[in-house]
A protein has these predicted regions:
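Secreted/extracellular ectodomain signature
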Residues: 1-171
Length: 171
């Protein structure tokens, strides 16, 4: 399952699922992508289909492994990953080094176990007000789910996850 960033940073009022869907389509990717965010309807840990959570590695756009599987992100250790494996945007840029993302932080709105934090998810990702708060993770921690709180006006990285495995029919 691919973990890919949106092509630009966003504040807390992001229509992230739509953006993930649209940018994946424009990049020619065939499967469905959902935002790596907890929402008012769903905890982040349940975004990927149950049948695909345990045996499929999580990889970047180029197929390099970030996690053994989806469940391993939510083991309570904050989604520890190898910072030497880049996370790419849908247009192929490395979010860790590209200046288009001046703040190397990802929004997630979740606990370390991938459960929604209703007080810290920018009012279900509908506001960019400075007074509203969102849970996010600085990537230099080497974690996707580090527990830091930021104002929703910040423009951070939004990740998208391929939410079900589709094998290549030409494979």
């Amino acid at each position: 399952l691919h973990l890919v960033a949106l092509n630009l940073p966003f504040s807390g009022d992001v229509r992230a699922d739509f953006q993930c869907f649209q940018q994946a389509q424009l990049a020619g990717l065939k499967s469905t992508y959902r935002a790596f965010l907890s929402s008012h309807l769903q905890d982040l840990a349940t975004v990927v289909r149950k049948t695909d959570r345990y045996h499929i590695p999580i990889v970047n756009l180029k197929g390099e492994k970030l996690f053994d599987n989806w469940e391993s992100i939510f083991n309570g250790k904050g989604g520890q990953f190898n910072i030497h494996v880049p996370i790419y945007s849908f247009d192929g840029r490395n979010v860790m080094t590209d200046p288009s993302w001046p703040l190397k932080v990802i929004w997630h709105g979740s606990t370390a176990n991938g459960i929604r934090l209703v007080s810290n998810y920018c009012e279900a990702w509908r506001t960019a007000d400075t007074g509203a708060m969102g849970q996010a993770s600085p990537l230099n921690t080497g974690k996707l789910l580090d527990q830091k709180v930021y104002g929703c006006s910040n423009q951070f990285i939004i990740l998208c996850i391929e939410n079900s495995f589709v094998s290549d029919p030409q494979g």
